[in-house]
A protein has these predicted regions:
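A short, basic/flexible loop-to-alpha-helix module at the beginning of a structural domain
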Residues: 1-11
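Active-site cofactor/cluster-binding pocket
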Residues: 10-20, 25-237
């Protein structure tokens, strides 16, 4: 069984795929601090970098749970997978380590109503076969609205906390903003406020869509099937 694990179910295992220049690793390091310092959970993080550094891909491996985490290896069976760059779906097997029923969060430049047709066929099949809970947000649109250019790190971090439920939503937002102030405070209040605005926008249900994929009704993939159903972020099942 490729998804067999000796780790207890109480350990949340999350993978984040990003680029060296998009701030994903920095945001995940902040998330570890938030989870480890502000909850009863223990937290662990490993970070894998492509040799090209800036502009190349990064993979963040985060674990957290109610007991000390002793695992000293990379995650091969994840309950949460986030892809912060749509183009990585063609380059990496992003969902290989996703457990059946896991959450998949995707930053997509396409509207939720179109994103299914834009996915590589293999990714469509994995979502169906593994019955993944699929969420999509246009992080770049939110970043642009907040005046942050291409920096999506705090936006995707907010989505992670909104979906994972590791902290109550408002408490998570408060902790994220505190981390933002510590991280970006030296750059000036304008930078801090732009990040705050991005967090406030990303937490809104209208931004983060849960695609209710009709598993079992899908017969033909990519190009012949347009996923019809989107909803505001409500239940995660």
């Amino acid at each position: 069984d490729e998804h067999f694990s000796t780790e207890p179910d109480s350990v949340v295992r999350a993978l984040f795929y990003g680029l060296g220049s998009d701030g994903t690793v920095g945001a995940n390091k902040n998330s570890i601090k938030i989870i480890g310092e502000d909850t009863d959970n223990f937290a662990q993080g490993y970070f894998v970098y492509d040799s090209k550094k800036s502009g190349s891909y990064t993979i963040s491996h985060l674990r957290f749970g109610p007991k000390p985490i002793k695992s000293s290896y990379l995650i091969s069976n994840a309950s949460f997978v986030a892809c912060h760059q749509f183009t990585l779906l063609e380059k990496l097997d992003v969902l290989k380590a996703a457990n059946p029923g896991a959450v998949f969060l995707l930053n997509s430049p396409y509207p939720a109503a179109e994103v299914w047709d834009r996915l590589p066929r293999k990714v469509q099949q994995q979502i169906i076969d593994k019955k993944l809970k699929f969420y999509v947000i246009d992080g770049y649109a939110v970043a642009k609205e907040a005046g942050m250019g291409q920096r999506i790190n705090t936006i995707m971090q907010t989505c992670f906390f909104a979906i994972s439920g590791v902290l109550p939503r408002e408490e998570a937002i408060e902790r994220i903003k505190y981390a933002i102030k510590k991280t970006y405070g030296k750059r000036g209040e304008i930078v801090v406020q732009k990040n705050f605005a991005a967090v406030d926008e990303a937490k809104e249900p209208a931004q983060l869509k849960h695609l209710q994929n009709a598993v079992g009704d899908v017969r033909t993939l990519r190009g012949a099937y347009r996923h019809p159903n989107t909803c505001r972020m409500q239940a995660f099942h």
